[in-house]
């Protein structure tokens, strides 16, 4: 148990960090070693043996992968470090997204034999979007094919990052024994089996030239960030270690540089210097820009991290716990929150009671009396709070920026086996969809089937497994189906008029709207613009018109799939002093949309996946031939040590069952990763097939 009072360190000594990477790069093992060396646990956990503290779900232990982002707290050199270990599998990217939204810094773990891999790119882009400062850890330096310098080069080429090596490895592969610290110019080698003991000593003679060359490169990069250091560097004066660290810290926090370290977490080497780097170079809550918020009057304000300020926090994750019910994970940005107090949910405009406050250690709970600015805490008692909601004081309500999540690309139908299962299933799928914003639940109006939509086959497999294990629901699972989308090719203008006169107050709504195609690769998939002038439609009805279009777009006119890539422009309309209402304008907008679709040329879109296959040379020909038969667009063929890497774009509909085919084509020696890339117009044959089913 942690002493709860010890948790409350000064904000400057707090680090909220995420551990992120491609699947199998060693994130969870790195986190397990961090917990061991900081004294948070006393036995070395193993992902392969299912004993990792941070992988606590049964499915995680069985599969040796991280599915949910797990949170924990540890201490290092008088600093408190809150860590979230995130999944590396693309199907669980939502866990990375919401973790990065509330963290101040991150450790990006790379497999030193592979460098930057597909999901490394995805999580890096997510971190870029939230401007999260990062340090890089080149893991698995003890593996055959490990190459520290190749891995750094891949960061430049694939991530367009500016990595700066602050260590170089001593030895490689089976001969990896330690690192050279380029800032202090000392060698560090590990002397005990569990990695808890190490010695600092002079740099080996055979490494001096390389160390001096790499230090020169490091100082040169730092000198670009600081004039005073540049002068000392040009005058060839001795550079103080603290000065170097200070400049590197500023450059890291400003996202100008990425410090790079190395080690072998599974062999217990390199973790203590990594912890030093977390403390030395990643930001505390007071080092990052104040979070932006909107007041009820629409004014944009900034909320600085202060314990004395008004309470403000973001619920970034909901979890159903079998013992305590619903847990809301909250990042506290300002003020203090006490157990038993009330909190205002400004997103839903309701007041809720904080029954308990808990600091989480994976699935273990430690009760707390209060939480302060900078904390990541789990709250019990918030019955109506969902992911992305703002929590604040009712006296000074604010609204933080909402969270956005990717659309699901694959669906399955599920049916309960018995009447008892049916009753339990309704509650279970509701609880799971509340936890996971990328899991969508729809009921087919014609068949009554429940359709689950998610990010990939593994995602939906885990969901159905959880239905059975955690909720005791037995279901029959249908074959996976592609989640198609629809869009428009042409611009079209149409009128929508809704008039009802049936005794008493009537209904009147009238709009003229233009609908234009938006680029499918752009940030926005829907845009609404009001171009009316002179009050032809009162302002209070405009949101209802936008809502009417959005609702109409949920079921496309071609095959009933949701529509994307549409700009709706309100041009004109009219209203009635007595009969007009929000409902009437909502209906009028949906009528205008349906009328415009007759001239906008709606088309069907299919999801396209970015596929990477790593395979021995002798199987490349057969695999490329198979991909071509699957309508793949081969992007590149690269070499990686003694393997080939095939990169391609393939329609999702062509990838069902691909793992089995690939195993057969490569005698089990190939591995593949697929992640959603974009939507593109489906060919006629696919359209015909889809329309037959509808």
UniProtKB/Swiss-Prot annotation:
Keyword Cytoplasm: yes
GO CC annotation, single: cytoplasm
MF-aspect GO terms: GTP binding; GTPase activity; translation elongation factor activity
Domain tr-type G span(s) in chain numbering: 12-286
Residues reported in the UniProt entry to bind GTP: 21-28, 85-89, 139-142
This protein's UniProt keywords: Cytoplasm, Elongation factor, GTP-binding, Nucleotide-binding, Protein biosynthesis
Matching HAMAP family: EF_G_EF_2_B
Entries under NCBIfam families matching the protein: EF-G, PRK12740.1-3, PRK12740.1-5, small_GTP
Function of the protein: Catalyzes the GTP-dependent ribosomal translocation step during translation elongation. During this step, the ribosome changes from the pre-translocational (PRE) to the post-translocational (POST) state as the newly formed A-site-bound peptidyl-tRNA and P-site-bound deacylated tRNA move to the P and E sites, respectively. Catalyzes the coordinated movement of the two tRNA molecules, the mRNA and conformational changes in the ribosome.
UniProt record similarity statement: Belongs to the TRAFAC class translation factor GTPase superfamily. Classic translation factor GTPase family. EF-G/EF-2 subfamily.
Stated name of the protein: Elongation factor G
Source species: Pseudothermotoga lettingae (strain ATCC BAA-301 / DSM 14385 / NBRC 107922 / TMO) (Thermotoga lettingae)
Lineage start: Bacteria, Thermotogati, Thermotogota, Thermotogae, Thermotogales
Gene name in the database record: fusA
